[in-house]
Amino acid sequence: MKIPRILLAAGASGSGKTLITCGLLQALVNRKLKTASFKCGPDYIDPMFHSRVIGTKSRNLDTFFTDGDRTRYLLAKNAGDCEIAVMEGVMGYYDGVGGTTSRASAYDLASVTDTPVILIVNSRGMSVSLAAYVKGFLEYKNDSHIQGVIFNQMSPMLYPRMKKLLEEELSVKVLGYVPKVEDCVIESRHLGLVLPEEIPELKNRLGKLSEILEKTLDIDGILKLAGKAPELSIPVFSDLIRKDSAFGYRSAEKVRIGVADDEAFCFFYADNLSLLEQMGAELVHFSPIHDTELPGDLDGLLLCGGYPELNGKTLEENQEMCSSIRKAVEGGMPCLAECGGFMYLHQEMEDMEGNFRKVCGVIPGRSFRTPKLTRFGYITLTEKKDSGLGEIPAHEFHYFDSTDCGTDFHASKPASTRGWDCMHYEGRLMAGFPHLYYYGNPKVPVHFLKNALEYKKERRQKKDAEI
């Protein structure tokens, strides 16, 4: 399959990847090009910027969660009908799992998808040294995939000389520069980037940025480079089923799954939801903040992560919803809760002001704030009681902890001997801090939907018995 594509990477975090990616995406959309965007790694927030503010179809591609075939399948699934796919890297280009490998790095994704890479270089304080810097990235790996360079924070006066220098000395195309643009800065917060709805006039800022990039980037050259990306051998879904039969599961009946979706609960992978639908789920979105009870006739409940700690007061005030969720879960409704959703299930949850808010009361004890990131990064979950789920790749990123994290799974860090017990896995409840990506282990959604169907049948039998 021919998918025009590029990957924007950098030597380090804070080099301008997100800003330039957003500006480029907006410029492509302005040109009326059907554009797909992808974030390398597990981050939720950048794809929300891409999709909600710019309007591109945006997904994650993560080679820790998925092998090469699944990664290429997801790329084709989400970009096969687009004119260009733009991938945004993560951290430094070669930085991967454990801090000592390139596994799950932007380089790893470029290798798995055979994608041309444009290296974004923060050029502040450098001139000729830029050539040495870029040369190091080009030569660190024989197959670096780096075919273009963009200079960030460069003056218009210096750019022509630096472009000439690099193109003469290195086998790489310089595709433009970005001057310092103070009024287009994206503000930061404790989880990385703020939500798009919280940045005043963000669309205005990106509109201005895209106008600047139209003048300072060689967008035609970027499109030409993307068009040179090699054809990919893309597996079809039946190939995934042959490798893991769980992908072939289809619920015998449609099951209604409630999905928490508002300003407090907004961290979910779109590919997770589409896989649930493919397996026979009808997704019913609701708001734990604004609705007073769960939607009717649900067979299962998804409580994803987000920012419940920023909405503690309103969540506590909505005791009708807390009671509705507690009664449903205690009554046997299957519930899958991750990170912020897990925090919300506690008896008490600390908010950002240090107040402990009374919430759902399903999990005993309280979730509380910690002074730094707690158990950050990729993990592999192993179930202790072995119900057939196997190993589950997962990810944690949170500034909160719990008096009762659960002990039904063991989490182990890749490239490390460190590990800990975590997760509640009792009856039809699966809850804890780890974030799950269903394409990494499709047995997780299958198990959830089987429980939902069982719960649906139980309710139907009970209803029939009452007639």
Tell me what each language-model feature is.
Residues 308-383:
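Cysteine-nucleophile active-site neighborhood
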Residues 2-19, 25-113, 121-148, 153-161:
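ATP-dependent carboxylate-amine ligase catalytic core
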Residues 127-247:
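Internal gly/pro-rich beta-alpha loop/helix module
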Residues 115, 172, 330-334:
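A short helix->loop->beta-strand "cap" motif at the edges of active sites that frequently abuts
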Residues 39, 174-182, 282-290:
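Beta-strand->loop->alpha-helix junctions that form or flank phosphate-binding loops
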Residues 255-319, 323-328:
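Phosphate-binding active sites in nucleotide-utilizing proteins
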Residues 5, 33-36, 254-256, 282, ...:
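Residues that mark the start of a beta-strand
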Residues 110, 215, 253, 265-277, ...:
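C-terminal and late-domain segments of enzyme folds
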